[in-house]
Amino acid sequence: MKSEEKSTNKEKQTLIIRKYHQYLKLEKALSPNTVDAYQTDLQKLLHFLEGEGIAILDTTLDDLQHFASGLHDIGIHPRSQARILSGIKSFFHFLVMADYLEGDPSELLEGPKIGFKLPEVLTVEEIDRIISAIDLGTNEGQRNRAILETLYSCGLRVSELCNLKISDLYFDEGFIKVEGKGSKQRLVPISSRAIKEIRNWFVDRNGGWKIKKDFEDYVFLARWGKNISRIMVFHLIKELAKKAGITKNISPHTFRHSFACLLYTSPSPRDMRRSR
């Protein structure tokens, strides 16, 4: 009898998790990467509850506080703790909203106290050094220069850069069309320097790059003919920063932060000038 009840609870939990996944994806319109992160963090709680013999719908505030204490005890960074607990609060909010629970046991759950950390940014001189570290003698050299100029002058998220299409480019008007989070579209100004580097890249792209079917409209391609990936851009920037002697811990998002900072001194991305 107990095993049948346990099996029923497991099936119900699986159904709830599936509906929560749909809620994050369709109603909240979160990106696939964000949905995966929420699900991964939720699995940590589910594993804990299973070990304690607690059904998800029987969870109390005490249970959640016990779980939160465990995150601290095993040395998880406070920022990661805060992210995990934020995702869990989102899950219990969904359970109440979907009428699985009458009250939210996570409502009074508190995360760790963390200070505000300013994001790492690059100076104009450091950006010049990184871009100058690109070897234009390689097949990917001009593409890489166009990638970094576009990231910097447009302040794009790396996913937006990877999915940029030729049909999204409006060079005569000085804009590109970008599809951001939640499939929301926006027009973004692009610098004349970035336009020049993309056009130079198109000369190489059209002069011998093999392009896979259905990927002809993507601006930035990998060697195997499909659009570049987020991991590729991450490794590219890490490699160039090391080559340029930049010791800051940077990523593609660092270019977005640097773009935002430069906007304080330049009224428009098209007014941004560098010495190179």
Regions found by a protein language model. Give the residues of each.
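Conserved catalytic core of the tyrosine transesterase superfamily
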Residues: M1-S266, R273
